[in-house]
Amino acid sequence: MYLTPLCWEAWEAYFRERGYKTLAPAWPLHGTAIAAQRQEHPSARLGALTLGEILASYRALISGLPEKPILIGHSMGGLVVQLLLAEGLGVAGVAIDSAPPQGLLSFKWSFVRSNWPVLNPSADSGTPIDLSFSQFQYAFANGMAEPAQRAAFTRYLVPESRRVGKGPTTDVAKIDYTRPRPPLLLIAGTADQIIPPSLNYSNFRLYADTPAVTEYREFSGRNHWLIADSGWQEVAGYTLDWLRGSAQ
C-alpha cells in the first residue's frame, strides 16, 4: 500500500543481474507517474478499489504467463502473495512484512497508530488516504536519517484506497491452512512499526499444520522499509538463496 512498482527497482536489477526475468506489475490505478497519482487525490475511482480487484488483476496476469512465477510481495503485497500461492498460482512465494490474513490482528500500539488511517471508524471508506510525511516516518521509515526518509517519501509515496487497507478483515483474505501449496517464506523486520514482527510470526504459526514448506526469518533492526532502506541487499540476498533452495 501507498507505493507503486517503482519501489522494486533495486530488487528487479538485483535479480536480473543474477539471471532472473522480473515483472513488477502495478496494482489497478497505480500505473501512472507518482506526481499524476498525487494530483488526482482524492480520486473516487481509487477510493473504490478493493483487495479483491487487485487479486483479480494478478490472476489475469499470471494466467497469460508461459510458466508459473516466483511471487514476492511487501506489506499488503505480502498478503497478496500468500493468497495467490494458496491458489497454486506460483512456484514459491516470499511475503515481506506481510499484512495479516483474515482472522489475525495486532493490538500493539505501534500497529494501531500506524494503521489508524485505515482503522479510524469515522473516516470515509470511499476517500483515499494521503499519508503524511510524519506518518510515513513513524510507520515505514523509523530509525532512518531524516534526509533518507524525505527522499523515500518524495520518490515513492502515493495516495491509497482505504478499502484495500480493510481487505485483510474480509473473506477475500481468508486462507485454508489445511491445503497443500508451494513453499512460502515470511520475512519480518524487528523494528517494523506498522506490521510488528510478532504479527508476522503469528501469521507463520497459522501454517503449522499446512502440508507445505513454510519458513520464517527476522532481520534485526529493520523497519518496514527494509526492501529499499540501506542494507536492502542483505534481505534480497537471503531471499535469493532461499528461492534457489526451495523453488525447484
Locations of the language-model features?
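Short, surface-exposed "cap/lid" segments of acyl-processing enzymes
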Residues: M1-A36
